[in-house]
Swiss-Prot record:
Mitochondrial matrix side: 77-205
Species of the source: Candida glabrata (strain ATCC 2001 / BCRC 20586 / JCM 3761 / NBRC 0622 / NRRL Y-65 / CBS 138) (Yeast)
Sample GO molecular function, one term: misfolded protein binding
InterPro entries with a match to the protein in the record: i-AAA_Mgr1 (IPR013911)
Keyword Transmembrane: yes
Membrane topology of the entry: Multi-pass membrane protein
Name of the protein in question: Mitochondrial inner membrane i-AAA protease complex subunit MGR1
Domain of life (superkingdom): Eukaryota
Subunit structure: Component of the mitochondrial inner membrane i-AAA protease complex.
Comp. bias intervals (Basic and acidic residues): 9-20
Length: 483
């Protein structure tokens, strides 16, 4: 929809000059007709241009359902024809097992030549009947006469004969006249006899069977496309084109503007009429117009009219590319899952090793405690008890925690090898390693050289003796017992 401005008043000459331009523009618009391309599908080609857009799932499923019903109807018709053919064959067989068409009636000798000629022409026998047996032919009289009926008019459902006479005359003038009448009657009933023949019935059965099979197979193919395919190139293309058309319409209607004589915009709050040249108003009106066009039944069914879908070969190429990429990413995902599983296995092994190490440490600690208990028991038996806790010997407590494990066969102290025990546990060596010495030189009063030397030596010996726990001999302090 565009803005239409009525032409102003002008003279006749100007109007005549503008006519060729208008005609030219109209002719251009007429020649520039938008083409319509049939929407693609796999199993709905029988519908021709009525196929909806590929993104219109509702329309596609509707046509699939209708087409499936038509196919089922064809199969139902085929089944009905088979039942009719079977019942007709059973009813037409008499007690002797011979169809009435194979029964030959001996005609009178008067008409043998004529009927023999007719049978030679048509190749079908005739049946002799009385006129009195047909009420429609003998309604107002009781005249009796012979009537010959062609056996091709036998009804398929009942063994009775139809009332379509070939010749009906009580007295025939001549055999030639009778054969002429029979030829004309047979020419008129030729098409009727064809539609009642077995060939026409066979043709209908084959037609309904093939039509039902083709229609149902096409419906199944389209249903598989709609359900199995996760990526449909036609559907994705139709969605993209529909969205582009919607946004292009918004831009188009925005630039076209608003005709104030046709459109009025009111404020939702105050109800006042707003000017149409405001950008916000133009944008809102353009959006509404685009939505209205998108909701058009024809656009909703077919999509954009000027949309040209991709060809079937391009559809197959895109589908193949999608499947290749899907397989590639599936391989990548499998490789990542394998790597994650490997890392998870490493974490599991690490946790198992951690638990195993904790168990080993607890087991070793338990064994050490049991060995300490065993050594304590042996020491008690031999009289070598451990130093009570809280007591110190030689200024350190490390010796109280040390223990010697004896063999099980040691029962008395004489069985212990003292040299080996001393080698393993040397108290003087441990004392030397664990004892730290601190030597301090403290100056004294200045006296003669001999006095300084003697006093220094005495201070040094006293310091060393204090560290070692020994009292010097020259000290005047009384000896105190050490603990």
């Amino acid at each position: 929809m565009g803005i239409f401005t009525p032409p102003g008043k002008s003279d006749k000459r100007d109007a005549n000059e503008e006519k060729p331009t208008l005609l030219g523009s109209n002719s251009k618009d007429e020649t520039d007709v938008e083409k319509f391309w049939v929407r693609p599908s796999l199993g709905l080609k029988l519908w021709g241009p009525l196929v909806p857009a590929s993104d219109n799932k509702t329309g596609l499923w509707t046509l699939v359902a209708v087409q499936s019903m038509v196919g089922l109807l064809c199969f139902y018709r085929f089944k009905s024809l088979r039942i009719i053919d079977r019942n007709g064959a059973l009813n037409s067989v008499g007690k002797s097992g011979i169809r009435p068409t194979s029964v030959l009636v001996n005609e009178p000798k008067l008409y043998n030549s004529a009927f023999t000629q007719q049978e030679a022409v048509s190749g079908k026998p005739l049946v002799k009947k009385d006129i009195a047996d047909f009420p429609t032919l003998n309604r107002f009289s009781t005249t009796h006469g012979d009537m010959f009926v062609n056996t091709t008019n036998v009804n398929r459902n009942t063994p009775s004969l139809s009332a379509a006479p070939v010749v009906a005359s009580p007295v025939l003038s001549s055999a030639g006249h009778q054969s002429e009448i029979m030829a004309k009657s047979e020419a008129k009933n030729n098409w009727k006899s064809f539609f009642k023949s077995d060939n026409w019935l066979i043709f209908k059965k084959v037609f309904y069977l093939l039509a039902g099979s083709i229609i149902l197979s096409q419906s199944m193919l389209e249903a598989c496309r709609l359900t199995i395919l996760r990526y449909d190139p036609w559907c994705e293309e139709a969605k993209t084109v529909r969205e582009k058309k919607f946004f292009n319409n918004i831009v188009k209607f925005y630039h076209e503007g608003i005709d104030p004589t046709k459109v009025k915009v009111k404020d939702a709050v105050s109800g006042n009429i707003m000017p149409t040249n405001v950008p916000e108003v133009r944008q809102s009106v353009a959006l509404v117009r685009a939505q209205t066009e998108a909701e058009n039944p024809i656009i909703s069914w077919f999509g954009p009219i000027e949309y040209k879908p991709m060809t079937f070969s391009e559809f197959l190429d895109r589908l193949e590319y999608h499947l290749d990429m899907f397989e590639y990413f599936q391989g990548k995902r499998a490789a990542n899952e394998t790597a994650l599983g490997f890392l998870t296995g490493i974490k599991t092994e690490t946790s198992n090793l951690r638990d195993q190490n904790a168990q080993n440490r607890s087991r070793i600690l338990k064994e050490l405690k049991s060995e300490d208990q065993l050594s304590n028991d042996l020491s008690i038996k031999t009289g070598n008890a451990k130093i009570p806790k809280g007591t110190q010997r030689h200024g350190f407590s490390a010796a109280a925690n040390r223990s010697i494990i004896l063999e099980e066969d040691v029962a008395v102290p004489e069985d212990i090898d003292l040299n080996e025990i001393w080698t393993l546990y040397d108290p003087w060596l441990n004392l030397a390693l664990e004892t730290s010495l601190s030597i301090k030189f403290i100056p004294t009063v200045l006296i003669n050289q001999d006095g300084i030397t003697e006093n220094s030596m005495m201070d040094t010996e006293a310091t060393i003796g204090d560290k070692a726990g020994v009292i010097p001999e020259n000290s005047n302090k009384p000896e105190e017992p050490r603990q």
